[in-house]
Amino acid sequence: MSAVMIAVVLLGLLALVFGAILGFAAVKFRVEGDPLVDQVESLLPQTQCGQCGYPGCRPYAEAIAGGDQINKCPPGGTATMEKIAELMGVEPQPLSATTEQQVKKVAYIREDECIGCTKCIQACPVDAIVGAGKLMHTVITQDCTGCDLCVEPCPVDCIDMLPVTQDIKTWNWKLSAIPVMQLEEDKQC
């Protein structure tokens, strides 16, 4: 019994010593990041789609902080670009020519052809595809950003990118543009 207690105490002390060493190393060797890059990255949609020409949102945020154009993010659209322009103190630019005329699309899986390989699930950066191994998969259209990264890995080519149709749920209501009349209260004489 005493040998077990000695082993438990020694392991506890060993864990405490190594924890202190790791804590010291984390403080001593901390890598300072650029706060501007962190702010720009927080504004980007985090789809990691690569449509901007960079391998993810963090490298694009670093490029923007280094002076690159702010209009290369199709999933973020004009709203994201305007927020980045405000943060960087530059004029908003129209989205780049390659993305300006594009219609928003979402992935659609033809479920009767899906073999359940899970390659599209692994490729989706926003977890908009649900399913399990050897079972059909489907796309949560509200979460899909249209990044197109799930199409290429599909071995049976059962994923299509379909344009988003406007309906009552997807319509962009501009409530501030609706005129509201202010009626004066009846004045008593």
Swiss-Prot record:
Residues involved in [4Fe-4S] cluster 1 binding: C49, C52, C57, C73
Tell me yes or no: is Lipid metabolism among this UniProt entry's keywords. no
Where does this polypeptide localize? Cell inner membrane
So what EC number does this one have?
Answer: 7.-.-.-
Which top-level enzyme class is recorded in the Swiss-Prot or TrEMBL entry? translocase
Q: Which domain of life is it from?
A: Bacteria
What biological processes does GO assign it?
Answer: electron transport chain
Q: Which keywords has UniProt assigned to this entry?
A: 4Fe-4S, Cell inner membrane, Cell membrane, Electron transport, Iron, Iron-sulfur, Membrane, Metal-binding, Repeat, Translocase, Transport
Q: Which InterPro entries match?
A: 4Fe-4S_dom, 4Fe4S_Fe-S-bd, 4Fe4S_Fe_S_CS, Elect_transpt_cplx_RnfB/RsxB, RnfB/RsxB_Proteobac, RnfB_subfamily
Q: Where does [4Fe-4S] cluster 3 bind?
A: C124, C144, C147, C150
Which metal ions or organic cofactors does this protein require, according to UniProt? [4Fe-4S] cluster
SUPFAM superfamilies in UniProt: 4Fe-4S ferredoxins
Question: PANTHER family, per this entry?
Answer: ION-TRANSLOCATING OXIDOREDUCTASE COMPLEX SUBUNIT B (PTHR42859:SF3), OXIDOREDUCTASE (PTHR42859)
Subunit structure, as described in the record: The complex is composed of six subunits: RnfA, RnfB, RnfC, RnfD, RnfE and RnfG.
Give the family, as the similarity comment puts it. Answer: Belongs to the 4Fe4S bacterial-type ferredoxin family. RnfB subfamily.
Its annotated function is as follows: Part of a membrane-bound complex that couples electron transfer with translocation of ions across the membrane.
Q: What is this protein called?
A: Ion-translocating oxidoreductase complex subunit B
Q: Gene that codes for this? A: rnfB
